[in-house]
From Swiss-Prot:
This is Small ribosomal subunit protein uS7. Coiled coil: none annotated. It comes from Thermus thermophilus (strain ATCC 27634 / DSM 579 / HB8). The gene is rpsG. Keywords: Ribonucleoprotein, Ribosomal protein, RNA-binding, rRNA-binding, tRNA-binding. Belongs to the universal ribosomal protein uS7 family.
């Protein structure tokens, strides 16, 4: 059992271009070694690429991509009588968002394109259309939860 208080959730500042907290969270996920300006530049360059390629509002494409990657269900390990069961559970809204942003960045980093902004732009466009690596990851997680529905009664 935890002996300390639960860490309070820090409120993020909205980003300067779109005034959106979700964009700030995504920039933070892109960031490596504390280089936030570089991460922000990568994201805004990706937005320009999205604008050029699709002609749509980049923020709309980004939000649609995040929505398409959010998992509804996931499995968690639960030990019962010496056996580990993969128990399907609903995902809280905060964790849905966190997982979606993480999976988008991971899927973008596995793409073959050389520039980070291009990788992120293409992954966001694919995810907004319901395809791409991040959407596949979401579907895999939800498929696992569906396959383990028999253990749903072990929920806590």
């Amino acid at each position: 059992m935890a002996r300390r208080r639960r860490a309070e959730v820090r409120q993020l500042q909205p980003d300067l271009v779109y005034g959106d907290v979700l964009v700030t969270a995504f920039i933070n996920k892109i960031m490596r070694d504390g280089k936030k300006n570089l991460a922000a530049r990568i994201f805004y360059d990706a937005c320009k690429i999205i604008q050029e390629k699709t002609g749509q509002e980049p923020l709309k494409v980004f939000k649609q991509a995040v929505e398409n990657v959010k998992p509804r269900m996931e499995v968690r390990s639960r030990r019962v009588g010496g056996a580990n069961y993969q128990v399907p559970m609903e995902v809280s809204p905060r964790r849905q968002q966190s997982l979606a942003l993480r999976w988008l960045v991971q899927a973008a980093n596995q793409r073959p394109e050389r520039r980070a902004a291009v990788r992120i732009a293409h992954e966001l466009m694919d995810a907004a259309e319901g395809k791409g690596g991040a959407v596949k990851k979401k579907e895999d997680v939800e498929r696992m939860a569906e396959a383990n529905r028999a253990y749903a009664h072990y929920r806590w």
